[in-house]
Curated annotation (Swiss-Prot):
Function: Catalyzes the reversible isomerization of glucose-6-phosphate to fructose-6-phosphate.
UniProt source species: Anaeromyxobacter dehalogenans (strain 2CP-C)
Record keywords: Cytoplasm, Gluconeogenesis, Glycolysis, Isomerase
GO MF entries: carbohydrate derivative binding; glucose-6-phosphate isomerase activity; monosaccharide binding
Keyword Transmembrane: no
Primary localisation category: cytoplasm
Protein name in UniProt: Glucose-6-phosphate isomerase
Reactions that this protein is recorded to catalyse: alpha-D-glucose 6-phosphate = beta-D-fructose 6-phosphate
Protein family membership: Belongs to the GPI family.
GO cellular component, one term: cytosol
Gene Ontology biological-process annotations: gluconeogenesis; glucose 6-phosphate metabolic process; glycolytic process
The protein's Enzyme Commission number: 5.3.1.9
Location in or out of the cell: Cytoplasm
PROSITE patterns cross-referenced by the UniProt entry: P_GLUCOSE_ISOMERASE_1, P_GLUCOSE_ISOMERASE_2, P_GLUCOSE_ISOMERASE_3
Length: 550
């Protein structure tokens, strides 16, 4: 048997899948369901309050058996155990990836470098809860003594996408006494529009940056600070209107924030895995400490399911392995995430970072090039039914094979006439249409003119999974996020990539730091970029003007 360091394509388990692919590829989902009417019940799994129907994927029970064999050959059980134990599974940075510790219950022992980290996690959670209650109750006031009416989270990447997504997803559970806004883009428009109609005396900024040096975040924070002081006129006001989510006490002090209002997290928490750490302070203020505990409980339930359930009935393992099958073997290199719940409108954007920053890698963990197969798929999507009137045309009749993840809930949070039945009817209909399509004969039988038959024919055989839960809530959201976290990890093990680093974001940062000096230079700088970049810089400098109307 090949060990984990062998190139993927040489493993017997992979070769068995390639042989199996040749047998399965010609089969249409129509044929698979005709042969096996009970397929819809058997190719499904349940855990942590989520139900996964993967019967409309282009797999058979033999496919799943072979994928599980591949996972075992690639060492998934051992790598999973290593992650839960706090071993340094982030090889290139020499760190643990211990987001599961963020939702571990009190009393559980999880060690990093010989130190139990669970007490520290709960110490931070307790401080967050006390602060959140102060803000929610009005006990925490601004510099002038007025209560806080708006919380603005300032961050980027994992310090923004998770909290922003969670706020929108849990809007039905949030306090309506306080408004929440999120600023991430270094484009000044983002901050300007976020604060345009706010009262500085009633605004609290949460500045989320582990190092407190992140370019975009600290640029926005400095401008927010200037906006506040322009109105309140006293440096002491900063300490009542700014809170830090950081580990750099010196920089936090220098900014004017009281270190007592600094909430930390750890190197073993990656940004895209941090929404249930102190990065989630805005979420806790919005839904309350009780709601945040429910969120953590949902994460924990899926953690335990991933850790304990057999791989063939393990939701994250199945989602991850089928994703490998689709992207690396079947040729479906893009995944449309289609939540049929408006509250999840930012969930696809959140998954873009989680999946693509984690597994968008061209070398293995040991630095060898990935050859002969793809790695991370491209994730995107929109809530239903909006997407049906946008890009579903391509899903049904385009030349690209797109795998789809439908997400829906049996009960709505906003009962309104027949809205929810119509919504869910569309979800089920789209999965059915993608799988089975419409033949030319069926189109003709409907009376379609012959010239239009090719246009009214749907090939079908487009793979999709459907995830159902009873109702969207904090616990359900936690389980859903953890499902994809662990699916990403599963794929990383199969592809042998480091799912916890992100070196691909560094080069652009370095070049931007160089270019901004050239843009801000008072005299025309000597440029040494390529011809295109030089020309763009010169044109920008010549035409930027000095006002919004230039």
């Amino acid at each position: 048997m090949a060990d984990r360091n062998d190139p993927l394509l040489r493993t017997p388990a992979w070769r068995a899948l390639e042989t199996h692919l040749a047998e399965v590829r010609p089969l249409h989902l129509r044929e698979l369901f005709a042969r096996d009417p009970g397929r819809g019940d058997r190719l499904a799994a349940e855990g942590a309050g989520l139900y996964l129907d993967y019967s409309k994927q282009r797999v058979t029970e033999e496919t799943v058996r072979l994928l599980v064999a591949l996972a075992e050959a690639r060492g998934l059980p051992g790598r999973r155990a290593a992650m839960f134990r706090g071993e340094k599974v982030n090889a290139t940075e020499g760190r643990a990836a211990l987001h599961v510790a963020l939702r571990a219950p009190r009393g559980e022992r999880i060690e990093v470098d010989g130190k139990d980290v669970v007490p520290e996690v709960h110490a931070v959670l307790d401080r967050m809860a006390a602060f959140a209650e102060q803000v929610r109750s009005g006990a925490w006031t601004g510099f002038t003594g007025r209560r806080i009416r708006t919380v603005v989270n300032v961050g980027i990447g994992g310090s923004d996408l998770g909290p922003a997504m969670a706020y929108r997803a849990l809007r039905a559970y949030t306090t309506r006494e306080i408004a929440f806004r999120f600023v991430s883009n270094v484009d000044g428009t983002d901050l300007a529009e976020a604060v345009r109609d706010l009262d500085p005396a009633e605004t609290l900024f949460l500045v989320a940056s582990k190092t407190f040096t992140t370019l975009e975040t600290m640029t926005n924070a400095a401008s927010a600070r200037a906006w506040l002081l322009a109105a309140l006129g006293d440096e002491r006001a900063v300490a009542r209107h700014f809170v830090a989510i950081s580990t750099n006490e010196a920089e936090v002090r220098r900014f004017g924030i009281d270190p007592a209002n600094m909430f930390g997290f750890w190197d073993w928490v990656g940004g895209r895995y941090s929404m249930d750490s102190a990065i989630g302070l805005s979420t806790m203020i919005a839904v309350g400490p009780g709601g945040f505990r429910e969120l953590l409980a949902g994460f924990r339930a899926m953690d335990e399911h991933f850790r304990d359930a057999p791989l063939e009935r393990n939701l994250p393992a199945l989602v991850g392995l089928i994703g490998v099958w689709n992207a690396s073997l079947l040729g479906a290199e893009t995944v449309a995430v289609l939540p049929y719940d408006q509250y999840l409108d930012r969930f696809p954007a959140y998954l873009q970072q989680l999946t693509m920053e984690s597994n968008g890698k061209r070398v293995t963990a040991s630095g060898a090039p990935v050859e002969g197969h793809g790695t991370g798929a491209i994730y995107w999507g929109e809530p239903g039914t909006n997407g049906q009137h946008s890009f579903y045309q391509l899903l049904h009749q385009g030349t690209h094979l797109v795998a789809c993840d439908f997400i829906g809930f049996c009960r709505t949070l906003n009962p309104l006439g027949r809205h929810h039945d119509l919504l869910m009817a569309n979800l089920f209909a789209q999965g059915e249409a993608l799988a089975f399509g419409k033949t030319a004969e069926e189109a003709r039988a409907e009376g379609t003119p012959e010239a239009l038959v090719p246009h009214r024919t749907f090939p079908g055989n487009r793979p999709s999974s459907t995830i159902l839960a009873d109702r969207l809530g904090p616990g359900t959201l936690g389980a859903l996020v953890a499902l994809y976290e662990h699916a990403v990890f599963t794929q990383g093990v199969i592809w042998d990539v480091d799912s916890f680093d992100q070196w691909g974001v560094e080069l652009g940062k370095v070049l931007a730091n160089r270019i901004v000096k050239e843009l801000e230079a008072p005299a025309d700088p000597a440029l040494a970029h390529d011809g295109s970049t030089n020309a763009l810089i010169r044109r920008y400098r010549a035409r930027r003007g000095g006002s919004a109307s230039s």
